[in-house]
Swiss-Prot record:
A molecular-function term among this protein's GO annotations: protein tyrosine phosphatase activity
Key words, A-Z: Acetylation, Chaperone, Cytoplasmic vesicle, Disease variant, Hydrolase, Neurodegeneration, Parkinson disease, Parkinsonism, Phosphoprotein, Protein phosphatase, Repeat, SH3-binding
Protein name: Auxilin
Gene for this chain: DNAJC6
Function of the molecule: May act as a protein phosphatase and/or a lipid phosphatase. Co-chaperone that recruits HSPA8/HSC70 to clathrin-coated vesicles (CCVs) and promotes the ATP-dependent dissociation of clathrin from CCVs and participates in clathrin-mediated endocytosis of synaptic vesicles and their recycling and also in intracellular trafficking. Firstly, binds tightly to the clathrin cages, at a ratio of one DNAJC6 per clathrin triskelion.
Chief site of localization: cytoplasm
Biased composition (Low complexity): 554-572, 654-669
GO biological process: clathrin coat disassembly; clathrin-dependent endocytosis; intracellular transport; regulation of clathrin coat assembly; regulation of clathrin-dependent endocytosis; synaptic vesicle recycling; synaptic vesicle uncoating
Species the sequence originates in: Homo sapiens (Human)
Length: 913
C-alpha cells in the first residue's frame, strides 16, 4: 500500500515537468529545423549566385571563339544574332568584349555570305561575301588586304576583326595574305605555319595556298603582273578512273566550269544518256572547248540515281574533285595543265582515288588581251613604305611572331618556294623571296566586292619557311666536305720498336694504311711473326716481326691477307721457318708437290736459327689441291692454324705455337726431318681423332683433332718466352697427356686443318678461323675416293628437278619479281586468312618494322583474326605507301589480304577448332 501510495503521490508531481520538457524539446527542435532550413537556403542561393557569376565570367573570357593572331589582327567564328543554346559566339557577347577592349577602334570583316545587323558593331562591318568552298577571287583578296592596311594605318590602336562561318579557311587565307601584303613574309610557308600555331585546324586547301602564292608574286620586289589573255580549255582528262559508283569500279562523271561563282558551262545531261566509265576504260575524256579568263573553277561530279522507277528515282551528285587557278599566271607557251591529287580540292575520301590519280587540261592561250571593265587593284599600286610593324603593337611582339613562324614543323622542302602550292604548269613563274616596299592609298569600304564566304576544308599540309632557312644557315657549313676528306686519311704508322730484342736489322718504314683499326688479334699476329696485311704463306720471311706492329711490311702486300683455300709450296708456320722444330737449325729441304705436300714441305728459304732474322719477300704461291698451312690471325678473334703440328714430328701440339722456341726467347726454326715417313700417321687417323694424345718429339703417334674443335690455350712462362698450356716444348723433361677435345665436328673423320685459339681470350674468340674453311671443304670431301664407284660427294643442282621448279624458273624470266614473290607467298594459302597473316612477315618490304610476326596460336578465334587483320591492313594499306617505291607492292599484299578476309566472312568466320 505504501508503495502504491507513493506512486500515486509522485505521479501528479512528475506529469507537469514531463509535459513541459516535451514541449520544450519540440520547440527547440522546430527552431533548429527552421534555422537549418534558413541557413541551407542562404548557402544554396549564395553558391548558385557564385556559380552563375563564375560561368558568366568564364563564358565571356574563355568560351568565346576569339583568337588574337597578333595584337591588331583578330580572328573569330560567325557571331550569331539570335539566341542559340550551344553556340559560342553571340553578337552581344562579342560586342561587349570588343567594346571593353577596343572601343571605337575596331572594324569587322564579314567574309561569309550570311549577314547580321551591322548596328551591333557600330556599323563598322565590311560585307565581303566570299564564296563557299572556294578560294576568293584574286581581285577581292587584294582589295580587302589593302583596306585592312589603310584601317590599321589610321590609328595605332585600331584592330581588324575577321570572321567567316567557322573562322577557319576563309579567315586564314585573308590573314595570311595580309602578312604577305605587309611584307612580314615573302612566301606562304611561314604565314601558314603561324596561322596553324595561333589557330589550329585552319584547313587550307591547295587552291588557297595557290592564291597565297599569287599574292607573293604580286608583291615581290619585281612584281609579276598577270596578263589578260583568254584561255581556251579544249578538254579535260582524268586518269585512272576513280571509284564512285556502288560497285566501286567506275563513275558517271560530268564537269562544270565556273568563273568566280558564275557557272558558264556544264556537261550534265539526262542520266540515261551520260556515259559510265569503268576501270578498264583507263581514263575519262570530256571535251569542253570553253574560253575563260580570270579566276577559273573546274569541278567534276559523279551523277547517281536512287533505286526506284523512273518517276520515283532521284538523281544526286557527288563531287569528285575541284581545282581553281587564275589564267593571268599561266605562261604564254603552256598547252597542258596537270594537277596531281595533292593539288586538287575536295578529295576527301582517299579510298575512292587510285594511285597516281591526276587531272590534265588541254589548254591554249589566245594571242590578244581581253579588254576588262574593272581595273585590278594591283595596277599602278606603289610598293613603297609598307612596314610589317603595322601588324604589331611592339617590336618584341614582331620578333616573337617571326620566330614563331620559323619554328613550326616543316613538311615541304623550302628550297624552291616559287613552286609552292602550285601545279606543274606554274614552273616558269617567279616566286621571289625578297621583300618589297609598298606605299598605301586610301580606299573606301564600298570598293569591296560582295561574294560568298567559304567553309573550312580538311586540314592539309604545313608548309616550309624561308625564315627557318635563314636562321639555320651557317657560313661555316661549307667546311664539312673538307672534314670528310680528312677522315679517310690514314694515321701515321707507328715507329718500329723492338721491345723484345727479336730483331737487329732495320725495318722498312713504308706501310700501307690499314683497312680497319688494329684489333687484339692483329697485334698478337705480329707477336707470332705475321703482319696484319701479310700473306698467308710467307715462307721466305724469317724472324719475328715487332710485337706491337699493327700491319705487315710493305714488301708483303702482294699476297692476300687471308686465304682459306690457297696453297703454297712452303706451308711453314710463321713462328719460325720450318714446319717442324729443329733446335739445331738444319736447313730445310724443298720437296715437290705430293698428296701431303702441304703438310710436309718446309720453307724453301733456309735460315740460321741463331743469326739475326732478316726479311724477305713472300714466296711464289703454287696451285695445289691441298689446303695451305696458315697461321694468319682472324680479325674476329681466332687464329687460322691450318695444319696439325703433330704430323710434323711434334705430337698433337708442338712448341712451334709459341713465339719463342727456346728458353732464352731466341726465335728458333724447324726443318723437316730427313727420315720422316710421309705416310706414317695414316694408320692411326681413325682411332686418334678424339683420343688423348701424348706429346712426343716425333709425329708417329700424333693424331688430328676435328676441324672446329677449339683448343684452350693458356700461356705458361718458359724462361722469358711463353707457350700454350696444352703444347709442350722439345726441351721439357717429361710429356704430359693432352685433354680430350670437345666434339663439335659434324662428322667423325680426320682433319688436316686444325683451327684453335692461339691466345687466351673469350670463348667467342676461339676457334673462329676455321669457320670459313670448313664450309668450303665439306662440299667435296672424299669426292676423289668415291667418284670412281658412281657416287657424288654433293648434290649436283644444275637445274630444276620438278615441273613446279621449271615453271617457277620460266615465270621468273618474264614476271615482275614483286608479283612472283606474292605468288610464292600465297602458294598453298589462297584465301586462307590465317595462313596469310601468320606468314605476312616473310613478304613485307625492307625497312618495315611496325608489323610483328604472329603465330597460328594467335589466330584461333574470329575475334583474334579480326584484330590481327586490322593491324595488317594498317601496315600494308596503299594509302600509307603513297609516293614510296613499295607502293604497288603494298597494294598487292593488301588485295590478297582483302580477298582472304572476304572469303573468311563468307564462310561464317568459323574458329580454328
Amino acid at each position: 500500500m505504501k508503495d502504491s501510495e507513493n506512486k500515486g503521490a509522485s505521479s501528479p508531481d512528475m506529469e507537469p515537468s514531463y509535459g513541459g520538457g516535451l514541449f520544450d524539446m519540440v520547440k527547440g527542435g522546430a527552431g533548429r529545423l527552421f534555422s537549418n532550413l534558413k541557413d541551407n537556403l542562404k548557402d544554396t542561393l549564395k553558391d548558385t549566385s557564385s556559380r552563375v557569376i563564375q560561368s558568366v565570367t568564364s563564358y565571356t573570357k574563355g568560351d568565346l571563339d576569339f583568337t588574337y593572331v597578333t595584337s591588331r589582327i583578330i580572328v573569330m567564328s560567325f557571331p550569331l544574332d539570335n539566341v542559340d543554346i550551344g553556340f559560342r559566339n553571340q553578337v552581344d557577347d562579342i560586342r561587349s568584349f570588343l567594346d571593353s577592349r577596343h572601343l571605337d577602334h575596331y572594324t569587322v570583316y564579314n567574309l561569309s555570305p550570311k549577314s547580321y545587323r551591322t548596328a551591333k558593331f557600330h556599323s563598322r562591318v565590311s560585307e565581303c561575301s566570299w564564296p563557299i568552298r572556294q578560294a576568293p577571287s584574286l581581285h577581292n583578296l587584294f582589295a580587302v588586304c589593302r583596306n585592312m592596311y589603310n584601317w590599321l594605318l589610321q590609328n595605332p590602336k585600331n584592330v581588324c576583326v575577321v570572321h567567316c562561318l567557322d573562322g577557319r579557311a576563309a579567315s586564314s587565307i585573308l590573314v595570311g595574305a595580309m602578312f604577305i601584303f605587309c611584307n612580314l613574309y615573302s612566301t606562304p610557308g611561314p604565314a601558314i605555319r603561324l596561322l596553324y600555331a595561333k589557330r589550329p585546324g585552319i584547313g587550307l586547301s591547295p587552291s588557297h595556298r595557290r592564291y597565297l602564292g599569287y599574292m607573293c608574286d604580286l608583291l615581290a620586289d619585281k612584281p609579276y603582273r598577270p596578263h589578260f589573255k583568254p584561255l581556251t580549255i579544249k578538254s579535260i582528262t582524268v586518269s585512272p578512273i576513280p571509284f564512285f559508283n556502288k560497285q566501286r569500279n567506275g563513275c558517271r562523271p560530268y564537269c562544270d566550269v565556273l568563273i568566280g561563282e558564275t557557272k558558264i558551262y556544264s556537261t550534265c545531261t539526262d542520266f540515261e544518256r551520260m556515259k559510265e566509265y569503268r576501270v578498264q576504260d583507263g581514263k575519262i575524256f570530256i571535251p569542253l572547248n570553253i574560253t575563260v579568263q580570270g579566276d577559273v573553277v573546274v569541278s567534276m561530279y559523279h551523277l547517281r540515281s536512287t533505286i526506284g522507277s523512273r518517276l520515283q528515282a532521284k538523281v544526286t551528285n557527288t563531287q569528285i574533285f575541284q581545282l581553281q587557278f587564275h589564267t593571268g599566271f599561266i605562261p604564254l607557251d603552256t598547252t597542258v595543265l596537270k594537277f596531281t591529287k595533292p593539288e586538287l580540292d575536295a578529295c576527301d575520301v582517299p579510298e575512292k582515288y587510285p594511285q597516281l590519280f591526276q587531272v590534265t587540261l588541254d589548254v591554249e592561250l589566245q594571242p590578244h588581251d581581253k579588254v576588262i571593265d574593272l581595273t585590278p587593284p594591283w595596277e599602278h599600286y606603289c610598293t613603297k613604305d609598307v612596314n610589317p610593324s603595322i601588324l604589331f603593337s611592339s617590336h618584341q611582339e614582331h620578333q616573337d611572331t617571326l620566330a614563331l613562324g620559323g619554328q613550326a614543323p616543316i613538311d615541304i622542302p623550302p628550297d624552291n618556294p616559287r613552286h609552292y602550292g602550285q601545279s606543274g604548269f606554274f614552273a616558269s613563274l617567279c616566286w621571289q623571296d625578297q621583300k618589297s616596299e609598298k606605299s598605301f592609298c586610301e580606299e573606301d569600304h564600298a570598293a569591296l566586292v560582295n561574294q560568298e564566304s567559304e567553309q573550312s576544308d580538311d586540314e592539309l599540309l604545313t608548309l616550309s619557311s624561308p625564315h627557318g632557312n635563314a636562321n639555320g644557315d651557317k657560313p661555316h657549313g661549307v667546311k664539312k666536305p673538307s672534314k670528310k676528306q680528312q677522315e679517310p686519311a690514314a694515321p701515321p704508322p707507328p715507329e718500329d720498336v723492338d721491345l723484345l730484342g727479336l730483331e737487329g736489322s732495320a725495318m722498312s718504314n713504308s706501310f700501307s694504311p690499314p683497312a680497319a683499326p688494329p684489333t687484339n688479334s692483329e697485334l698478337l699476329s705480329d707477336l707470332f711473326g705475321g703482319g696484319g696485311a701479310a700473306g698467308p704463306t710467307q715462307a721466305g720471311q724469317s724472324g719475328v716481326e715487332d710485337v706491337f706492329h699493327p700491319s705487315g711490311p710493305a714488301s708483303t702486300q702482294s699476297t692476300p691477307r687471308r686465304s682459306a683455300t690457297s696453297t703454297s709450296a712452303s706451308p711453314t708456320l710463321r713462328v719460325g721457318e720450318g714446319a717442324t722444330f729443329d733446335p739445331f737449325g738444319a736447313p730445310s729441304k724443298p720437296s715437290g708437290q705430293d698428296l701431303l705436300g702441304s703438310f710436309l714441305n718446309t720453307s724453301s728459304a733456309s735460315s740460321d736459327p741463331f743469326l739475326q732474322p732478316t726479311r724477305s719477300p713472300s714466296p711464289t704461291v703454287h696451285a695445289s689441291s691441298t689446303p695451305a698451312v696458315n697461321i694468319q690471325p682472324d680479325v674476329s678473334g681466332g687464329w687460322d692454324w691450318h695444319a696439325k703440328p703433330g704430323g710434323f714430328g711434334m705430337g698433337s701440339k708442338s712448341a712451334a705455337t709459341s713465339p719463342t722456341g727456346s728458353s732464352h726467347g731466341t726465335p728458333t726454326h724447324q726443318s723437316k726431318p730427313q727420315t720422316l715417313d710421309p705416310f706414317a700417321d695414316l694408320g692411326t687417323l681413325g682411332s686418334s681423332s678424339f683420343a688423348s694424345k701424348p706429346t712426343t718429339p716425333t709425329g708417329l703417334g700424333g693424331g688430328f683433332p676435328p676441324l672446329s674443335s677449339p683448343q684452350k690455350a693458356s700461356p705458361q712462362p718458359m724462361g722469358g718466352g711463353w707457350q700454350q698450356g696444352g703444347a709442350y716444348n722439345w726441351q721439357q723433361p717429361q710429356p704430359k697427356p693432352q685433354p680430350s677435345m670437345p666434339h663439335s665436328s659434324p662428322q667423325n673423320r680426320p682433319n688436316y686443318n686444325v683451327s684453335f685459339s692461339a691466345m687466351p681470350g673469350g670463348q667467342n674468340e676461339r676457334g673462329k678461323g676455321s669457320s670459313n674453311l670448313e664450309g668450303k671443304q665439306k662440299a667435296a670431301d672424299f669426292e676423289d675416293l668415291l667418284s670412281g664407284q658412281g657416287f657424288n660427294a654433293h648434290k649436283d643442282k644444275k637445274g630444276p628437278r620438278t615441273i613446279a621448279e621449271m615453271r617457277k624458273e620460266e615465270m621468273a624470266k618474264e614476271m615482275d619479281p614483286e608479283k612472283l614473290k606474292i605468288l610464292e607467298w600465297i602458294e598453298g594459302k589462297e584465301r586462307n586468312i590465317r595462313a596469310l597473316l601468320s606468314t605476312m612477315h616473310t613478304v613485307l618490304w625492307a625497312g618495315e618494322t611496325k608489323w610483328k610476326p604472329v603465330g597460328m596460336a594467335d589466330l584461333v578465334t574470329p575475334e583474334q583474326v579480326k584484330k590481327v587483320y586490322r593491324k595488317a591492313v594498317l601496315v600494308v594499306h596503299p594509302d600509307k605507301a603513297t609516293g614510296q617505291p613499295y607502293e604497288q607492292y603494298a597494294k598487292m599484299i593488301f588485295m590478297e589480304l582483302n580477298d582472304a578476309w572476304s572469303e573468311f566472312e563468307n564462310q561464317g568466320q568459323k574458329p580454328l577448332y
